[in-house]
Amino acid sequence: LHHHIISDHHTLKLVLDDVARQLNEEKTHTDDSVEVVPYRAYIAQALNRPQHEDEAYFKAQLSHIDTPTAPFGIHHVPVTAHTPNEQRYVIEGALASELRTATRRQGASPAVLFHLAWAKVLGLICGRDEVVFGSVLSGRQSTPGAEHMLGVFINTLPLRISLTDFPPSGTSTAGNSVASALKATFMQLTELLSHERAPRALARRCSGVASP
């Protein structure tokens, strides 16, 4: 059983690696065990972590945002028993390779490009030049010893992206602007990563959106 509500990909890898070691030890009669850091160590770090830097960051990012970025202005979708419709688009090998090369040339990654592309989509369907949406973070990058911990660390936090300097495609400056926007998005994500353990409720309180 694997689900992000109880674990993440790295946890699954640690478990499978441990199983492989156990099987190997039975064959070779050796002890290759690796010490695992208790998950409670992460909980203690999270509880004792000062939040003033997180609060200052999210206030600077979100205090002027007073309306959620709701696609087509739809804020609440009724929950029904029907299976939601899904649309999938597979990026084939050649295009995937081109995307990796293009983003690497700008010192970024395809993940940064997809964040920027989604921001552009939201901006168009919401009629806004600044959007905010959730970005899923691993939660392990700023946690000492996390590479040896089993458990869930994933956190989803709001990312703000400005589209004011992003001209329409086909214009003479579009290419340069995409590169500039990609770099700006990379910087935004890098800053957000340094606050990846901040509670989502704290980020919400720092925005100008009224509580429901």
Where are these regions (language model features)?
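Active-site-proximal acidic secondary-structure segment that organizes catalysis
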Residues: 1-38, 123, 134
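Short amphipathic alpha-helical segments
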Residues: 11-17, 110-118
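Short amphipathic alpha-helices and their capping loops
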Residues: 17, 21, 35-87, 94, ...
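Generic detection of short hydrophobic beta-strand segments and adjacent strand-loop junctions
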Residues: 28-29, 70, 87-91, 159-161
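Short, hydrophobic secondary-structure boundary micro-motifs
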Residues: 30-34, 68-73, 132-135, 200-203
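His-Asp-centered acyl/peptidyl-transfer active-site segments
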Residues: 47-55, 85, 102-115, 124-212
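Soluble acyl-CoA-dependent acyltransferase catalytic core bearing the H(X)4D motif
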Residues: 62-68, 91, 102-104, 137-138
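Aromatic/hydrophobic pocket-lining residues that form π-stacking "cages" and hydrophobic walls in ligand
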Residues: 99
